[in-house]
Regions:
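Short acidic, glycine/proline-rich loop/turn micro-motifs
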Residues: 107-110, 173
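Glycine-rich NAD(P)-binding loop of Rossmann-like domains
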Residues: 110-124
Length: 176
């Protein structure tokens, strides 16, 4: 009973921070939501965000989480530009989405800069625990990302990838 009351309260707290939120959203005691000035977070219908999930943006960033998507415990969605997670996605625990190199760096003779590119996860994607999805990546519809994979390049639709850096393990996969 206490868990139910706490979940309703934390869902209410999370909804207050969001730009838009669909029907049947549930937030089970997420860690925190920090939105930079001018940023937006849009969450679709029937989304469940588990415990200790962190959503954080820089200024004028966008995060979209599609209908019927699940974000597991300890997942981090960090956006400086845009992170778009499609419909019907299953995101396991402790997954990291990061659309930036985070700190400025320079290769000898070049200007110091931070690399920023949007992340797009298409519909019906399954991402295993402790996977990392880095800047500029598009994960194709129906794909599966293995546990602990570090995704640095686009993943074609219906493809299983794993490893560090992630590589194709199997093509033409399906999952329920």
């Amino acid at each position: 009973m206490f868990d139910n009351i706490r979940d309703r309260y934390t869902t209410w707290l999370v909804k207050r921070e969001l730009t838009s939120c669909g029907k049947n959203f549930r937030g089970r005691n997420p860690g925190y939501i920090f939105l930079g000035k001018g940023s937006e977070v849009h969450i679709g219908d029937n989304v469940l965000i588990e415990r200790k999930v962190r959503i954080s943006t820089g200024e004028n960033a966008r995060i979209y989480i599609g209908d019927d998507t699940y974000l597991g415990d300890g997942t981090n969605v960090l956006s400086v530009k845009e992170v778009n997670i499609g419909r019907g996605c299953a995101i396991s625990w402790h997954v990291l989405f990061m659309d930036t190199s985070s700190h400025p760096f320079a290769i000898r003779g070049q200007e110091l800069r931070t690399l920023i590119e949007p992340i797009r996860v298409e519909d019906h994607v399954w991402i295993g625990c402790r996977a990392v999805i880095l800047k500029g990546v598009t994960v194709g519809e129906g794909s599966v990302i293995a546990n602990n994979a570090v995704v640095t390049r686009d993943v074609p639709p219906r493809t299983l990838v794993g490893g560090n850096p992630a590589r194709v393990i199997k093509e033409d996969v399906t999952w329920e």
